[in-house]
Design a protein with these regions (language model features):
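Small-polar-interrupted transmembrane alpha-helices in polytopic inner-membrane proteins
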Residues: 59-78, 118-184, 221-229, 284-294
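Di-metal (Zn2+ and/or Mg2+/Mn2+) metal-binding site signature of metallo-dependent hydrolases
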Residues: 103-125
Length: 330
């Protein structure tokens, strides 16, 4: 079953598939197996890369970095940065243009390189998870939406938060990267939910909600609420983004309520019964690590000069759009 009609990755082999051993045998096999070697993981990675069309990989990883590099070498693009001295995004045509274009220009080569590398890191995990979840087309639509909407919304939020504090120009692709971080949270859970569905299809007697385990994609909202609670509650280290304990507490309550509702409706998320092969397990571990590092690096531990308000907008929009699809899928 797919979320949007495009093909999913072929099912990975699982312990006990078709051999009649039952779930207890699966658990013993899982416990007895040895960790994969680096060579085995490398072979699995290369096989996964070769299984995807080269044109599709190029479309995912090359056009946006090429655009950012091209903009950086064009003469006169320094004027594309957003001045925080303006009164609003709609003040003039020039302001509206710079509100959009500022997300595609950078202040230094290091700034550009940092955002390109972050983009590749995020998509290196988000793309294979999208294949597993059946979200290849949804990733394309989300990318187009992020490029069109996030720059304007992040510019508006930046002007509201910092417009009266400084007149320094704002620039950088980190708001859109933060949107991909939000997407990654949604697709991480969606991919695990797809794994759960395939496991249930193989063993109808071990339906979701039994001791076989499984993950519901809607648990992603708990992670987002919890991460926003930490972002607003923890000291950021910069004066222009002080802790807001009341806001953090509201998000913490929202996370707790969402967790309670989901626990009552679908049970807690459990990975034990899905039967992932080691290489697939590694993908989810890396994805979770990228999410954790991304939230800390863009929303919690904020370097001076980093536009955390743009990051927040990108993260929330980036999660909300695909999560709306999860809700629509039922």
């Amino acid at each position: 079953m797919t979320a949007d009609g495009d093909g999913t990755e072929p099912d990975a082999p699982r312990a006990g598939d078709g051999d009649g051993r039952g779930p207890n045998a699966d658990e013993r096999a899982s416990a007895d197996r040895t960790p994969p070697t680096l060579s085995e993981l490398s072979s699995a990675f290369l096989a996964a890369v070769r299984s995807r069309p080269l044109a599709e990989l190029a479309l995912v990883f090359l056009p946006l970095p090429a655009l950012l590099v091209a903009v950086s070498v064009l003469p006169g693009t320094e004027s594309w940065r957003l001045s925080l001295a303006v009164d609003g995004v709609l003040e003039s045509r020039v302001t509206l243009w710079t509100a959009f274009s500022s997300s595609f220009v950078h202040t230094t080569p290091d700034h550009l390189l940092d955002n390109v590398l972050n983009y590749w890191l995020l998509l290196a995990v988000a793309y294979p998870l999208s294949v597993i979840a059946g979200w290849r087309r949804r990733l394309l639509y989300a990318t187009l939406a992020y490029l069109a909407v996030v720059p304007l919304l992040s510019a508006w939020a930046t002007l509201v938060a910092l417009g009266g504090v400084t007149d320094a120009p704002a620039a950088g692709f980190s708001d859109v990267n933060s949107a991909f971080l939000g997407y990654l949270v949604a697709v991480w859970f969606a991919a695990l939910a797809a794994e759960t569905e395939r496991t249930d299809d193989r063993a109808p007697g071990l339906a979701a909600g039994s001791d076989s385990g499984g993950v519901d994609a809607r648990w992603a909202v708990v992670v987002v609420f919890a991460s926003l609670a930490v972002a607003y509650g923890a000291p950021s280290g910069v004066g222009y983004f002080p802790p807001l304990p009341a806001v953090g507490a509201l998000f913490a309550v929202a996370a707790a309520v969402a967790a309670g509702v989901l626990y009552a409706a679908v049970g807690r998320p459990r990975l034990s019964g899905i039967g992932l092969v080691p290489a697939r397990e590694l993908l989810y571990v890396v994805g979770a690590s990228v999410i954790l590092a991304g939230v800390i690096g863009s929303l919690v531990v904020v370097p001076f000069g980093s536009n955390v308000f743009a990051h927040l907008v990108g993260y929330v929009v980036g999660f909300t759009l695909p999560f709306a699809g999860v809700i629509a899928d039922g």
